[in-house]
């Protein structure tokens, strides 16, 4: 059985990156919540 985590920088950025977050309304809400909480990193 293969491991479920197969790291890829491109896939990571495309799904969880800043631009991906900004593209949807829900993603913008995520960023707003993380800013309100005072997170150092908004996106991984």
Swiss-Prot record:
Any one GO biological process: translation
Annotated GO CC locations: ribonucleoprotein complex; ribosome
Coiled-coil residue windows: none
InterPro entries hit by this protein: Ribosomal_bL34 (IPR000271), Ribosomal_bL34_CS (IPR020939)
A Pfam family this chain is assigned to: Ribosomal_L34
Residues in the signal sequence: none
UniProt KW keywords: Ribonucleoprotein, Ribosomal protein
Molecular-function GO terms, alphabetical: structural constituent of ribosome
NCBIfam families: rpmH_bact (TIGR01030)
Protein family (similarity comment): Belongs to the bacterial ribosomal protein bL34 family.
Name assigned to this protein: Large ribosomal subunit protein bL34
Protein source organism: Thioalkalivibrio sulfidiphilus (strain HL-EbGR7)
Gene name linked to the record: rpmH
